[in-house]
Amino acid sequence: MKFNPRVSSSRRKNRKAHFTAPSSVRRVLMSSPLSKDLRNKHNVRSMPIRKDDEVQVVRGTFKGREGKVMQVYRRKWVIHIERITREKVNGSTVNVGVNASNVMITKLRLDKDRKSLLERKANGRAAADKEKGTKFSAEDVMENVD
């Protein structure tokens, strides 16, 4: 159900917005889930993927392969990973693009901006968890029973 009247439900408009999205929006759309240990450590489920992150492919032809992200190719919506290549007919090797949603981040490249992003996301998640289940107090429930 749509709550905000300014948000379109039109398939045509959503596809246009997706495929003409600027690089700054594509960065967020090209996010990948974190591994279980990173998720527990940082209390964050996913992050925008970035060059020099270490990832593991979890779906597709290259499932199980691991490597470092060499390039995030936002124009093509793919990432290039070390050692995931294909040999062309003329003998040269080219990187094969992998969808960011098909990989899992196993090691983050952290700098001050990324650390602050992790903190912000973790704080927001902690606040949401704290509010969860406190919509009604026990007294409110018992009041309405009678």
Curated annotation (Swiss-Prot):
One Pfam entry name: Ribosomal_L26
GO biological process, one term: translation
Record carries keyword Nucleotide-binding: no
UniProt keyword annotations, A-Z: Ribonucleoprotein, Ribosomal protein
Biased composition (Basic and acidic residues): 119-138
Keyword Translocase set for record: no
GO cellular component: cytosolic large ribosomal subunit; cytosolic ribosome; plastid
GO MF annotations, alphabetized: RNA binding; structural constituent of ribosome
Record-stated family: Belongs to the universal ribosomal protein uL24 family.
The protein's name in its UniProt record: Large ribosomal subunit protein uL24y
Organism annotation: Arabidopsis thaliana (Mouse-ear cress)
